[in-house]
C-alpha cells in the first residue's frame, strides 16, 4: 500500500503541474528514500499502471486522505516520532517538499507570466501555493463563514478553524526546545524551504516571489490561512519593525501599480491597534472587495492646496478618510500631511490624546487600491490609549463584547471581516441547545459569559425555533462585530463625533507651512 501511495502522490504532482513528466522517476526515488524503502513493490506498480488516471479535481480531493495514509505509515514504522498534529504537519510538509519545483523555477514562471499579465502571474502562484499544500485547502473548507447585514453594508464573519490547536506534548516539547533565532520570525525570507521544528512550522513547500517596491527588496507570498480570496502578505526583505510613515504610502501605491487587481494595506505600528506581528515590516492584500471598500462617502471634504484630490469621510463605523486621485504623488503628500497632523493631534473634549507620559497614541491603518483610472488611499485613524475602565484600550472592543471578540482590531477587521476564535463553533452549538431548551445560561461554566448578550437579543424575536435559531445566532454575532468596530472608531457615528472629526480636518488644513519646515529640518 505504501508503494501505491508513493506512486499516487507522484501522480498528484504531475496532474497539478508540480512535477514535470521528466521528473517522475526522480520524484519516486526521493519519496522511497524518505520512507526508508529500497524499491517499489511490483504488485503496486502493476496496480498503478492499470489505474484510470486521476483528474485534477480528483487529485485535489484525494490529497488529505493520501497524506494521512503516508503519515500513518511513517508513524507505524518509526519514521515519524510523534503522532500529533504538530509533528504530522512537520512531516507532511517534508513530503510535499519532495514534489516542489525549485524557487528559481517558480520565480522564472511567475515573471514570464507577469510580463504578459499581472493577474495571470498571481493566478499561477496562488494555485501553486494551494497545490503544494502550503495553503491546506481541506482545512480552509472547515472555516465557518457568513455575512451580516448592517447599515454600513454586509460585514464578513469567519470562525477560523484551519489553524490547528497545539497538543499538550508539542507545547511541552516547545518549552524544552533550544531557543533559535533562525528564522527570526514567521515572515522572514529564510522560512522558504526551512524544515521547521516543534515551535516553528515547516516550509519546504513554501515559495516566495521577489518584488521591488519603492526601489527596495520585498517579497510576495500568500497567507497559509487565507481569510479571504488570494489573501497575500507582502514583506520586507529585511527583518525591520513596522513603521507607518510617508514612505509607507509610497510603497502601498507602488505595489498597487504593479498588481492593480489587488488591494494592499498595512497594520498600524502601535500595540493594541496594530496586528500580531509588529517586529517585521509587512503589508496584507488580496483579490477581494471588503465592505469598507464598497462603503460610500458620507461627507465630501476639501483639503487646502489639494483641491485636485477627491476626499471625504467614509460611511463606516471606524474613522476613515478616503483620498482619490490619478496622481499617486499627490496622494502621498496629502496622506503624509494627515499622518503628521494626526500623530501630534490632541482634542481633550473628544478624548483624543497624542501622547500620555511620553507614550505616543495616534497612528493610522492605511489601505490602497486602484479604482478605474484613480488610485485610492483609505486612512483609518487609530488611537491606543488605555484607562482603568478600559485597560485593553478605549478604542478597542469593550469588555461587554469580549465574549465574542477581545483580540486586536487589525487591518482585516478594520476593513469589515471578523476573524473570530475557534471556540465559538462549539459555543454556538451549545447556545443553540440551551436557548431552545430554555436552560439557565448563568449556571453553565462555558456559556455564562454569553448570558447578558442572549438576554438582550431574545426579546427582539417573536418566535425562536429549530429552523431559525442558527440564523438568529449568526445575525447577532454579526451585530456584535458591528459594535466592535464602533468601539474601535475614534470618532463616533453621532453628531458630536462627526463635529469632532471635522475639527481634525480643519486642523490638517491649517498645518501647511509647519510641515514644510519640519521636513526641511529633518
Which residues does each PLM region occupy?
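Active-site microenvironments that recognize anionic phosphate/pyrophosphate groups
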Residues: 1-234, 238-241, 317, 331-335, ...
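Helical scaffold of the NTase/Pol beta-like nucleotidyltransferase catalytic core
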Residues: 205-208, 237-264
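Catalytic or ion-translocation cores adjacent to nucleophile or general acid/base/metal-coordination motifs
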Residues: 247, 256-279, 285-339, 343-346
